[in-house]
């Protein structure tokens, strides 16, 4: 297990900035106002060859109400999980009542805790930070997270005890590790072709605000991992959560809700939307959550379009299905059939994230979609299916000539890409292209993922070439012309 370092403190003391600095990413949203971070956010960092996990948390100040109470609970859970707690304070503001309350809580925990005074650039750090010794948590460590000052010294002083413990543990188990390495090397050659299959499946849960994405995430995990509150825009960042189900690894991505562009004016919401779109591009399977009571909206269709253009596999979950009468359910199903007819390959589930109804069957469709997207298909199989499709329904005539499909092969996967070579293939009507796509989908039993077919037309080998006449041919032409003139 990698050691865990939790970053805690009041709002707006620089926890997310330090998180980004330690993980060398820009995963955590950063803005100059309090309360931006809400859920626990995990990242992996490396110092001097030693890897560790960093947890970014929401700010706590003791005056929480509403959704802030949920944020504080997430921060307290992070403290319980951590091996080391970095308690961040603001060197410019000085010690506050909230700092004292957090320190009182930390002293009761059996954790290695270090006080980190941030924002020390441009001030006399020693004099400004002297009052923090009243917190009775030991030495005060000075840093400027936004500029990266003092970070290396902080890691040296805080990680050194933990590194010593890990080194002793590594020495105790080194002999056993050598045997395991030998066994791994023997099996690695045989299992190398399964490397892709062994990667965790990234599942992004997307949808409009307040449709139940975080509730569904917590239901799948069986714990209150992300904040759930009856208010649109509760989730602000994309939260990556590893999990295991039936001995298979997944990474759940809980994302912020996406509204229509004209309604998005807040800067933080704009960044949240960008994070959601990045999560769609980063994942393997997209789980679109739709509110049954609100019905399918144009914004849902926009999200679907972005997911399909990104080539992601797709599963649709209609949430809040419980409590609806049969008439309303039939009306909703008719609307879904009408508006989602263009993605008939995607599995549709009717669920209740709050009560767990139908949630267990989602992963059957997720696995099916992922396996379809990453399926390897031989060239012989693709060509045979192409020939069968032509035999059942010939390509149409274009300018009096029959379009000829000559050859097919795989052009990639995730999503499946099929390349078809032939004559006049660029002139094929869209109806025949859809026929080929559906024929391949049915023959290969591909569900849950789009299929992309690329048509390539053979170049004319004589295009642009000039017919060169030899000297003897020129003499014959002149003699023939002279003979015709004499006649």
UniProtKB/Swiss-Prot annotation:
How is this protein named in the record?
A: GTPase Der
Family annotation (CDD domains): EngA1, EngA2
Q: Which InterPro entries match?
A: AAA+_ATPase, G_ENGA, GTP-bd, GTPase_Der, KH_dom-like, KH_dom-like_a/b, P-loop_NTPase, Small_GTP-bd
The KH-like domain covers which part of the protein?
375-459
Assembly description = Associates with the 50S ribosomal subunit.
- Organism from which the protein derives: Pseudoalteromonas translucida (strain TAC 125)
Q: Where does GTP 1 bind?
A: 9-16, 56-60, 118-121
Q: What does this protein do?
A: GTPase that plays an essential role in the late steps of ribosome biogenesis.
Amino acids binding GTP 2: 207-214, 254-258, 319-322
- Cysteine pairs forming cystine bridges in this chain are none
């Amino acid at each position: 297990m990698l050691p865990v370092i939790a970053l805690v403190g009041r709002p707006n003391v620089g926890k997310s900035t330090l998180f980004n600095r330690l993980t060398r990413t820009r995963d955590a949203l950063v803005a100059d106002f309090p309360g931006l971070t809400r859920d626990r956010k995990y990242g992996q960092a490396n110092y001097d060859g030693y890897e560790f996990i960093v947890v970014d948390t929401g700010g706590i100040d003791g005056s929480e109400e509403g959704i802030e109470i949920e944020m504080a609970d997430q921060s307290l859970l992070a403290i319980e999980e951590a091996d080391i707690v970095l308690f961040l304070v603001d060197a410019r503001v000085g010690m506050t009542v909230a700092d004292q309350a957090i320190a009182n809580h930390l002293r009761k925990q059996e954790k290695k805790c270090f006080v980190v005074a941030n924002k020390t650039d441009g001030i006399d750090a020693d004099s400004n930070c002297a009052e923090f010794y009243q917190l009775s948590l030991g030495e005060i460590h000075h840093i400027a997270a936004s500029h990266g000052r003092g970070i290396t010294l902080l890691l040296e002083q805080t990680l050194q005890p933990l590194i010593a413990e890990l080194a002793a543990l590594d020495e105790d188990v080194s002999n056993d590790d050598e045997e395991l390495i030998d066994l791994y090397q023997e099996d690695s050659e045989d299992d190398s072709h399964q490397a892709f299959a062994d990667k965790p499946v990234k599942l992004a849960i997307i949808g409009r605000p307040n449709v139940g994405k975080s509730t569904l995430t917590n239901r799948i995990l069986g714990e209150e991992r992300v904040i759930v509150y009856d208010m649109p825009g509760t989730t602000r960042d994309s939260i990556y959560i590893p999990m295991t189900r039936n001995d298979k690894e997944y990474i759940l991505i809980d994302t912020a809700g996406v509204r229509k562009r004209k309604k998005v004016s807040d800067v933080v919401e704009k960044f949240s939307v960008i994070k959601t779109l990045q999560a769609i591009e980063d994942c393997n399977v997209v789980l679109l959550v739709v509110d049954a009571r609100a019905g399918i909206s144009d914004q849902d269709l926009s999200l679907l379009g972005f997911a399909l253009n990104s080539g992601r596999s797709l599963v649709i979950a209609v949430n809040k299905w419980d409590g609806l009468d049969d008439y309303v359910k039939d009306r909703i199903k008719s609307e879904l059939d009408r508006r989602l007819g263009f993605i008939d390959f995607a599995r549709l589930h009717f669920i209740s994230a709050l009560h767990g109804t139908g949630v267990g069957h989602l992963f059957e469709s997720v696995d099916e979609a992922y396996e379809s997207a990453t399926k390897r298909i031989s060239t012989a199989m693709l060509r045979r299916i192409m020939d069968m499709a032509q035999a059942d329904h010939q390509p149409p005539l274009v300018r009096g000539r029959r379009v000829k499909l000559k050859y097919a092969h795989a052009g990639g996967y995730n999503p499946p890409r099929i390349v078809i070579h032939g004559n006049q293939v660029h002139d094929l009507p869209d109806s025949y292209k859809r026929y080929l796509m559906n024929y391949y989908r049915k023959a290969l039993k591909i569900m849950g993922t789009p299929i992309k077919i690329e048509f390539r037309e053979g170049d004319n080998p004589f295009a642009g070439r000039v017919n060169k006449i030899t000297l003897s041919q020129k003499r014959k032409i002149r003699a023939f012309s002279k003979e015709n003139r004499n006649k």
